[in-house]
């Protein structure tokens, strides 16, 4: 088994279809083998399990209240609504399980536990993967830290052309299937912040894949980029490029290449023009 360090980040706004992409990647074969996710973390799954207890045994780490509270205090994620004292009293760590008292906001506690687990896995040099809305810059910081620590960082990003699509999906699909609701205003504001974080994420990732899922049930992989040092190799399926990606074609690249030129060449190839 390969000991190479890998971090896999599945990112995209609420309701974009990250679960669909994760399922597809799990089923994929690379050189005849399944993709190695390492330890997989999903804050939503942590939140659902907190009442009875979230299983920590897959992590094979020495975790506990002291380390968790030290992380929480330095994280900047505690405030007047979720204090260090509340966490000390309400988050209960066992040998292989962590649970939370009902009085604590389970989604916020789950996010904090997830962040703690990322940090511990990174420090332990373990392979891991996680799912994120990607609206907060701390995920970019995590990717940078992983890259500096010798990880190959893989980014799997999916979005839609309009946050209204995401709002409707969360309402119609996730809630009806037992998923948690997210306020409309949050979905829209997160969509914008997530999209703003994409260019930097692409500059950090060793290998990135981008899907458009504007039409539900037909996610299209339209772009793949792989980096070697400061040089990037882009594979753009020009005929599939969605409207939401067009502004990124104008973002300057570290190696001096212009994505707009790469896009034009890809479009010419698609149409069979000689100078492509």
Describe every region a protein language model picked out.
Residues 7-9:
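Short hydrophobic/aromatic beta-strand immediately N-terminal to the Walker A/P-loop
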Residues 13-14:
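The conserved Walker
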Residues 19:
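Walker A/P-loop
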Residues 26-123:
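Conserved substrate/cofactor phosphate-moiety recognition/catalytic segment
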Residues 148-197:
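A glycine- and Lys/Arg-enriched "phosphate-lid" helix/loop adjacent to the NTP-binding pocket
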Residues 181-225:
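Small-molecule kinase domains that catalyze NTP-dependent phosphoryl transfer to phosphate-bearing small molecules
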Residues 210, 215-276:
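C-terminal accessory extensions appended to soluble enzyme cores
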């Amino acid at each position: 088994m390969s000991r190479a360090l890998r971090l896999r980040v599945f990112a995209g706004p609420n309701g974009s279809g990250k679960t669909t992409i994760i399922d597809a990647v799990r089923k994929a074969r690379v050189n005849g083998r399944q993709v190695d996710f390492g330890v997989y973390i999903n804050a939503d799954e942590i939140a659902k399990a907190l009442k009875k207890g979230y299983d920590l045994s897959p992590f094979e780490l020495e975790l506990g209240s002291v380390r968790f509270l030290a992380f929480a205090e330095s994280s900047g994620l505690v405030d007047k609504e979720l204090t260090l004292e509340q966490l000390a009293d309400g988050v209960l760590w066992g040998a292989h399980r962590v649970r939370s008292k009902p009085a604590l906001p389970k989604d916020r506690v789950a996010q904090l536990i997830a962040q703690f687990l990322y940090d511990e896995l990174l420090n332990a040099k373990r392979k891991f993967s996680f799912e994120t809305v990607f609206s907060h810059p701390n995920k970019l910081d995590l990717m940078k830290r992983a890259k500096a620590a010798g990880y190959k960082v893989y980014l799997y990003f999916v979005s839609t052309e309009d946050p209204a699509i995401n709002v409707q999906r969360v309402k119609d699909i996730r809630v009806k299937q037992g998923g948690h609701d997210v306020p409309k205003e949050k979905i829209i504001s997160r969509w914008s912040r997530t999209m703003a974080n994409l260019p930097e994420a692409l500059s950090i990732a060793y290998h990135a894949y981008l899907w458009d899922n504007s039409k539900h049930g037909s996610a299209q992989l339209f772009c793949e980029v792989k980096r070697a040092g400061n040089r990037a190799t882009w594979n753009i399926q020009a005929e599939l490029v969605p409207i939401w990606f067009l502004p990124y074609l104008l973002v300057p690249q570290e190696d001096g290449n212009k994505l707009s030129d790469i896009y034009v060449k890809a479009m010419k190839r698609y149409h069979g023009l000689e100078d492509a």
